[in-house]
Amino acid sequence: SHNTRLMISIWANFGPWTPQYKELEKIGALYPFETWPMKRGVKPYDVFNPKARDIYWKYLTALYKMGVDSWWTDSSEPDHFSKEGDNDYMTYDGTWLGVKNAFPLMHNKGIYEHQRAMKGNDKRSMQMTRCGAFGLQHYGTFSWSGDISSSWDEMEHQVPSGLNYVICGTPYWNTDIGGFFGGEYGNDPKNPAMQELQVRWMQWGCFMPLMRNHCSSPMLDELYEWGKPGDWAFDVQKKFIELRYRLLPYIYSNAGDVVLNSEIGRASCRE
């Protein structure tokens, strides 16, 4: 009733206590790589193996039927701590060295194709991945700039990062507004310098193709953490969040141009 949609975070790695791990292990579709979280025996799955992609989706089916609208495919590089010999490992499609840059593409492709194949499905597939490559847009997938720190330098770097990304053919991109990790001002919402950085980032974020606030504790995510009505940092952020909602007809029209007229990157990252 409030036009709220649900996106959940799903990873490409599994721990040995999970049913996914056990099923993937039976078909030899787990990489012997160390990944996050460390020292827990967690392994990425072989996204190049179509049977492995089938298994991955099988465990998402119930969530999809419950009404999950989109997928946050985090750790899609995968989050891999490289060691000697990893590059020579043979995946389903060849050596890890030869195919690893296509890992996020195949991971997201598997999710997209399985969702679209669901009986009676009329929902568009939407995925946000931390890492990507040419062709992601074909599978309803976009990226953000990853887990960045909270600083003016980092915010400045996001501008060319976004422009370079969309010019590669994937028009939707975003950044963690305010930064993901703590930076030069800590995480004190009463610090005027931190307020200034957060507010300016929120103002800029209002005009990105996708607007998204995201951080890691103890950084601050919620508007109410920045004060109350009448406080500068609260009021300005609220104003631009509301402006974003008023811009939705324009944003939706832009999205139509991207799809129907192939105007790559026309979404507000370039306008």
Predicted regions mapped to residue ranges:
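Catalytic-domain carbohydrate-binding cleft regions of carbohydrate-active enzymes
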Residues: 1-270
